[in-house]
Amino acid sequence: MKEKFLALIAAVSPADHSLSGAAQAHLDDLTKPQGSLGRLEEIALRFVQATASLSPVINRKKICCFAGDHGVAREGVSAFPSEVTPQMVYTMLSGGAAINVFARHVGADLAVVDMGVNHDFPDHPVLVKRKVAKGTGNIAAGPAMSENEAIGAILAGAALAAEAHDEGYHLLGTGEMGIANTTPAAALYSVLLGVPVDGITGRGTGIDDERLQHKKEVIKRAVGVNAGLCTTPLGTLAALGGYEIAGIAGFILGAAACRVPVVVDGFISSAGAVVAMKLCPVVADYLFFSHLSNEQGHRAVMQALGARPILDLDLRLGEGTGAALAMQMIEASVKMYNEMATFSSASVSEKDGE
């Protein structure tokens, strides 16, 4: 299993920056003042680089929502009980969750991936069963999982990305569902990015001031208890993470290995992205951070990564909702790149002096 994990990381190559000159020249030749479409031009350029194609396409889009339960929920860090995780999975399977609505709106297919929910689901066409275990260990008392379990979750996520590539998807998105998962996400950020727990920890599902302070203490305890295990990115993931977070990290690695761009959702999905980037820094070339989450600390994470999210809508739901909405912006960017007329081909006068 470790060999497959190392092979996955080795399979990721940087984006093709040799195409930058030609792609930028094409963008500048489009019938508009140069740079007037702002970040849409930047997005199109990055998409060309990631896909290594001067004629990029987005014919199919898919969002994978990874679900898992967390032992640390027993510490009372969430406003909701763990039973809500399988309940929300069922809502997604029935088509009634926010991510279902948004995925339908943007024309993206949706898969709900059971990475570690403490429940046995019946078969369903939208459900992908990749359960590693029925929930993680309580990180406030010890590690979330073993390194082998973390690798297993990573490889499962990577395989889903490879399958999506083989099925003809050109743009992938991440989502998640798991009560209490802002707690392991904050713990991972604290260790992997060196940000203070107090500044990275937010209210998650809407906890009050007293429970927020308790949550911060739980995270600090988790980081302290597991300090000896957090010597590598993989060890840190195993000690403090979640099965859905590990699945997202693998999904990103697998997509990057296939040169498929990934739209990262919010606070928890970004933790999976940080894990992937720490394991293999060049995956950053393939990531589009969808939105700035309203969850406290996400801004600090984006600043630490030097990332600029596409949207800022005060979202804090997760599920892949922000990723779905940002897919529209990316798709518009690629259509702009491909479908606009150029000064070279159209009877449009260029700027005086050119």
UniProtKB/Swiss-Prot annotation:
Keywords assigned: Cobalamin biosynthesis, Glycosyltransferase, Transferase
Pfam families xref list: DBI_PRT
Top-rank taxon, per record: Bacteria
Chain ranges passing through the membrane: none
Purpose of the protein: Catalyzes the synthesis of alpha-ribazole-5'-phosphate from nicotinate mononucleotide (NAMN) and 5,6-dimethylbenzimidazole (DMB).
Homology family: Belongs to the CobT family.
Reactions catalysed: 5,6-dimethylbenzimidazole + nicotinate beta-D-ribonucleotide = alpha-ribazole 5'-phosphate + nicotinate + H(+)
Protein name as annotated: Nicotinate-nucleotide--dimethylbenzimidazole phosphoribosyltransferase
Residues the record marks as active site: E319 (proton acceptor)
Family matches, as InterPro entries: Nict_dMeBzImd_PRibTrfase, Nict_dMeBzImd_PRibTrfase_bact, Nict_dMeBzImd_PRibTrfase_N, Nict_dMeBzImd_PRibTrfase_sf
Gene3D superfamilies named in the record: 1.10.1610.10, 3.40.50.10210
Example GO BP: cobalamin biosynthetic process
Pathway connected to this protein: Nucleoside biosynthesis; alpha-ribazole biosynthesis; alpha-ribazole from 5,6-dimethylbenzimidazole: step 1/2
UniProt-listed Enzyme Commission number(s): 2.4.2.21
GO molecular function: nicotinate-nucleotide-dimethylbenzimidazole phosphoribosyltransferase activity
